Amino acid sequence: MTFGFHIKSAYISAQEQFPESNPFLPGFIREYILANALGHKLNPQKKGVDAWDNLNQGVEYKTFKSGKWGRFNVEIQHGYEKHLVGVSCWYFAEFSSAFTISRIWRVEIDKISQYCKAFMSRTSKKTGHIMIDFRVKWIQENGILIDFIGNSSSSDFIRHLSNAQEIAIEQFGVSDITLKGRIREIMIAEKLGHSIIVNSKKADANDEFGNQFEYLTSLQGNFQMTHMTEDNSEAKVLRNKSIYCAQFETPVSISEIWEIEPKIYMQKMATRRPWPTDRQNNFTVRINWVRENGRCVYKLE
């Protein structure tokens, strides 16, 4: 059975529990595992609190792999305060592997607020986004270590994901499919016969001849390349032999894949340059442009 087969099975299982949700949005899988471990009710939508505890109070989740730390992405113009409204506390969960929690801490919201306020007072950055880092030492000093039920290995959703993870390791060398974009990347690579490049600072995939490729994906027909600057944009595009735009019909079904020549993509990008230095720059091309300027290499029958 293929990686895609197990991912589709996981999607069906998640839909039975959370209809109309997309279980492959960033953070969903880990938050699902954490909510089950704590006996919380997960909010399957991206907006609002992450979950509700046994007292029906809103809580926020931050998850990270062992050796890393909790991160909080703040848009400076809007401030951090709005993210703390309606939340009683934050739970930090350390994962020892893709689907296994090793430790959970609870930190009260007043301590989170104080830390964020102090962090923001020290930064000189006035626009764009900033990451507030919560190091494990700070979490240990300010949080309470929580006993938890266990992990969600018995759920059909996680069981199917675990099967997909085994294939990801064996065939693509990917040790954690919960990372942002990984599932879609592997599904595309499976269609095109490519290998995955696991280093996030490099291209997304390569072929047997060493040619590199960038993968852009969309459900709505908008294909976005993120974090563009004058220093990196040409290298991010021109290092690739091709850019592939994969249109997803559902979160687990690719309807079409189009191949774009990097030089054509650069010509389109020229209309947006030079890139401003005071904000995060994302470059988007739409499905109509892709179809007019690309070559179709896969179409769902």
Q: Where do the PLM segments sit?
A:
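Nucleic-acid endonuclease domains
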Residues: 1-301
